[in-house]
Amino acid sequence: MDIRNLKYVKQFISHNLINFKKKTYKNSNKILVEVYDYKPSTIPISYLSNILAQKYQANIVGYYSNFPSMKKKFKTLLEIFNPYDIKKIYKSFGVEKFIIPKKSKHTAVEVLFTKIFKKINTKEDVLDIKFDGIVFGDLIYDEFLRSSNRMTINITSKQFQYFLKDAISLYLFWKNIFKLENFKSVIISHHVYFMGFVSRIAIFKNIPVYSIGITNIQYLTKLNQSKHCAFKSYSEVFKKFDISLQKKLLIDAEKKLTNRFSGEKDIKLLMDRHTDRDFYNKNISTKKILSKNRFKVLISAHQFSDAVHVYGYKFLFDDFYEWIDFLGKCIEKTDYDWYIKFHPSEHEKNYKHINYFSKKYPKFKILPND
């Protein structure tokens, strides 16, 4: 934590201790709240968890979504000496205990692994993985890419097989926890990666799930398990507004889009992760990049390992690697100029992937990061 922010954390803890009077309910009801170490998000989390605790007369329990790594264990050890660590923040608004995942019994994991793995013949089969009728394949796929910084999955690799066993072990842990505990509601930070395991199980059991961020809250259901599900109903909701409000909103939207494309800083850009680039300077480059007199195709590539299936998993391609690889093959059938602009987020992390495609398809013209 930046030492300059310590005073704000101290103020927040004091605020919580004053406004959220600790109350212990003598029943089994619990509100399960993800421990998410992004300080701005703890503000709405603190309020929502207490509202739900009051509604259900329930105690608040914090949880970590994944097995602790050695790095995480070491960090937890150091937090003992930090008066303002994330656990102390959660305790300040009423969290009584914390659930930390532990590896499940080896035999149970091996039995389920054998059953699941024999059905995996393609990467698409990974996306279709289900445990007890609940789809977890997309979460497993994305967590593997993210944790190993890979573009795609090699289903025959030992690394993936070991990883799949860990995923099974994590599922069995949470399956058992949900059997033992009486959770009345669940609060999560994200519905992707291994963080999504808890919400998938809770939704399957008809337990109310809320995905919360610094600017919004989504109620997740069996039909809408994504925090982005609200986008689907935007047009229908918009039609319910009176004409004068619709006009005002359209003008405001046009202004925001204009500002975005002109490089102005807005709330979305300020919240996004650091890109190692300054998009807001006024320097005009005279460097010639595009060739003349030929039809041009621009590919705006994604970040290869960043929640590939965040919007779902039934698409034309299993991942972003398959998409770019397909386009690379298309190059051979055209006389166009093909330019590819890689995602600026975590550009250095993505660099080995950029090199891979530039060597495999030399006709790809890689645009500079700036």
Map each language-model feature to its residues.
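Conserved N-terminal ligand/cofactor-binding loop architecture of enzyme catalytic domains
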Residues: 1-30, 51, 55-168, 214-277
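Structural motif
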Residues: 34-38, 63-67, 188-192, 301-303, ...
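A short, glycine/small-residue-rich beta-strand->loop->alpha-helix junction that serves as a flexible
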Residues: 35-45, 306-312
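Histidine-anchored nucleotide/phosphate-binding helix
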Residues: 39-62, 317-331
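Hydrophobic beta-strand scaffold residues
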Residues: 59-60, 207-210, 216, 338, ...
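Conserved nucleotide-sugar donor-interacting segment of glycosyltransferase catalytic cores
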Residues: 170-224
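Conserved catalytic-core segment of nucleotide-activated headgroup transferases in glycan assembly
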Residues: 262-360, 366
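Conserved active-site histidine-acidic residue motif and adjacent donor-binding/catalytic loop
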Residues: 369-370
